[in-house]
Amino acid sequence: MGEWPQEWAYGEIGDVVGGKVAYADVQEGTFRLECREGFMGNGVENTPFIYRKIKGDFSFSCRVNAIKGNVSECGLMAKETLAGGGNAVTMTLGHFGRRFARMGWSVKGEKKRHFAIGNTYTWVPAWFKLVRVGRVFYAYESTDGVNWFYVHSTRMDMPMEIYVGMIGSFREGKRGNYVVLDHISID
């Protein structure tokens, strides 16, 4: 494991215990995100975040290659601020046996995350993509990174420059919780 590309940074939103990240320059960029505890839920936003700033429209994809331990959710996030709260859009795998692929979004001031469910039998490795076109965010999933299936879209007011990256939601405070995300692409 080595130094990650300088455009990427690691941050923690809210209360995160034992968060750390490692990078390897293989499989088009591979991040291993580890955490003892950092949970996202209704009104709660505590998550480790590997991110970079992006201005304007984009297409961001990665593959969730491995999940170990008490990981309730992992995947992609686009967020207007690194602080808790604020508008955010996610495309993640998790919940209910760690097999639900779903788009999520939260609106500043609300204590609720909204969800649109994709495939309810998604297994790793799984590919996810978030696309921004103006004020609309689109979410997709794939089994091979080539053939993409539309999950949902939502209109979300965010600044032109936002934070885009990879997240994990970890529970129970145990060691050895991690996710491996690779084949990272931003256009």
Would you name each region that the model predicts?
Residues 1-187:
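Extracellular glycan-recognition regions
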